[in-house]
C-alpha cells in the first residue's frame, strides 16, 4: 500500500511536498485503517487551481510510466516557475511488511533520467542517464548500458517487463498491487485500468453479471436494480435491444414501479454511478489504488458520502485517493482528520498541503 508520495518542482509544487498515508494517533473510524497501519485513502480539498489534481497526477504517472507508453522527458511536468530544469517524484510503499522506496528525477533540458529503488533501505536499483545497475537478482549487481536503458523510459519498467521480478517476491507483489489500480476522471468520464480489471460496464456485466452491483444497491437501500439482457419487461412496457439475441442492453428498474428504463434514459447521476461501479468494486475486492479526480462531478453529496463509507468498510488492502469539492465529506463520521488534506496555492511558493 502507498504510504508516502513526495513531489518536487513538479507542476504547481515548486517546493518539495510530501503526502503521508500512515495513520496518526486518532482512534476514530478504525475501519478506515488497514491492518498494517496504513490509511485506506485520503481526500484532497481546496480552491480551484490549487494543485489538488496534481497530487493525483503524481501517483497516476507512476502507473502510466510503468504500464503505459508515456514519455518521461516531457517538459509539461516541470514547475514553470520553479528552480532548475529537474522535477522528481518519490514513493514509499509497504508491501508484505517490507518498505519499498522508489525515486526518479527527470532533467528535461539534458534529457537525463535518474532512478533509485530500495527495499528496507537496501539499494536494489540505481540508474543515471543511459547506465544502470541492478541488485535485484544478483547481490553483486548487474550492469546495464545504452543497449538496455532507454532514454525515455523508466528502467524499472524495462526490468519488470523483461523479468517480472520472479527472483524477488516483494517486487513482484508490488507490481501486482500497482497493476490492480484504476484511475477515474469523473469530469471527463475517463477510466483507466492498469491491469486486467474490466471497467467497461457492459463487459463487466458480461463476465460478472448484475449480482454484485444489485447487492450494492440493496445493501444501501437504493430502491432499484439493474438488468442486463436482450429484452426487459415490466408493467405494460417491454424493451427489446436491436439485433440478434446476443445483443444486450442495461435497464434500470425502480422498486415499486418495475418498469424498465434503458440506461441512456436514466438520470445522469445514475449513469455516472453505474459507469464507475465496476472500477469501484474491482479495487475493493482485489486491492490496488482507486484514484478519482473530480469525484463530486455528477454526484449528490449523500451518494459521495455513502461510497466513501462503503469503500472504507469493505476494502482490505486497497486505497482510495480522491479530489472533491464536497465539504460534507470532511465530517469525522466519514473520514478521519489524518485522511484530510487541504491544498492551497500560495503565489510564488506554489502549491502547499496541510493535513
Per-segment meaning from a language model:
Residues 1-65, 251-355:
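Switch/communication elements of ASCE P-loop NTPase nucleotide-binding domains
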Residues 5, 87-92, 112-119, 247-255, ...:
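Short polybasic amphipathic segments
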Residues 18-21, 100-106, 122-137, 260-265, ...:
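Short amphipathic beta-strand/extended segments with alternating polar/hydrophobic composition
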Residues 37-43, 47, 56-107:
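Conserved P-loop NTP-binding catalytic core
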Residues 95, 107-109, 345-349:
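Short acidic-glycine loop/turn motifs at beta-strand connectors
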Residues 103-230:
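Electropositive, glycine-dotted interaction segments
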Residues 182-194, 242-259:
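A short mid-domain helix/strand-loop element embedded in enzyme catalytic domains
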Residues 224-243:
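Long, charged, glycine-rich C-terminal linkers/tails
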Amino acid at each position: 500500500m502507498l504510504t508516502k508520495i513526495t513531489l518536487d518542482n513538479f507542476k504547481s509544487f515548486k517546493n518539495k511536498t510530501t503526502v503521508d498515508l500512515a495513520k496518526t494517533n486518532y482512534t476514530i473510524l478504525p475501519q478506515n485503517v488497514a491492518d498494517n497501519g496504513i490509511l485506506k485513502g485520503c481526500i484532497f480539498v481546496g480552491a480551484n487551481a490549487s494543485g489538488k489534481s496534481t497530487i493525483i497526477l503524481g501517483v497516476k504517472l507512476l502507473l502510466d510510466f510503468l504500464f503505459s507508453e508515456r514519455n518521461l522527458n516531457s517538459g509539461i511536468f516541470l514547475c514553470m516557475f520553479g528552480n532548475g530544469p529537474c522535477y522528481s517524484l518519490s514513493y514509499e510503499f509497504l508491501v508484505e511488511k517490507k518498505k519499498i522506496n522508489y525515486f526518479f528525477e527527470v532533467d528535461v533540458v539534458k534529457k537525463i533520467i535518474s532512478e533509485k529503488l530500495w527495499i528496507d533501505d537496501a539499494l536494489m536499483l540505481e540508474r543515471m542517464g543511459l547506465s544502470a545497475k541492478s541488485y535485484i537478482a544478483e547481490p553483486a549487481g548487474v550492469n546495464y548500458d545504452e543497449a538496455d536503458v532507454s532514454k525515455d523510459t523508466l528502467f524499472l519498467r524495462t526490468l519488470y517487463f523483461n523479468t517480472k521480478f520472479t527472483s524477488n517476491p516483494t517486487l513482484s507483489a508490488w507490481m501486482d498491487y500497482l497493476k490492480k489500480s484504476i484511475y477515474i476522471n469523473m469530469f471527463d468520464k475517463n477510466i483507466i485500468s492498469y491491469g486486467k480489471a474490466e471497467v467497461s460496464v457492459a463487459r463487466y456485466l458480461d463476465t460478472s453479471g448484475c449480482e454484485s452491483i444489485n447487492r450494492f444497491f440493496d445493501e444501501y437501500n437504493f430502491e432499484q436494480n439493474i438488468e442486463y439482457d436482450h429484452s426487459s419487461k415490466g408493467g405494460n412496457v417491454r424493451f427489446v435491444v436491436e439485433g440478434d439475441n446476443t445483443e444486450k442492453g442495461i435497464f434500470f428498474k425502480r422498486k415499486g414501479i418495475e418498469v424498465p428504463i434503458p440506461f441512456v434514459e436514466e438520470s445522469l447521476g445514475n449513469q455516472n454511478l453505474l459507469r464507475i461501479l465496476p472500477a469501484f468494486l474491482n479495487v475493493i475486492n482485489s486491492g490496488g489504488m482507486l484514484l478519482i479526480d473530480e469525484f463530486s462531478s455528477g454526484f449528490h453529496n449523500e451518494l459521495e458520502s455513502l461510497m466513501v463509507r462503503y469503500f472504507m468498510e469493505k476494502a482490505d488492502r486497497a486505497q482510495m485517493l480522491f479530489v472533491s469539492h464536497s465539504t460534507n465529506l470532511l465530517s469525522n463520521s466519514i473520514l478521519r482528520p489524518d485522511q484530510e488534506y487541504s491544498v492551497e496555492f500560495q503565489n510564488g511558493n506554489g502549491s502547499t498541503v496541510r493535513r
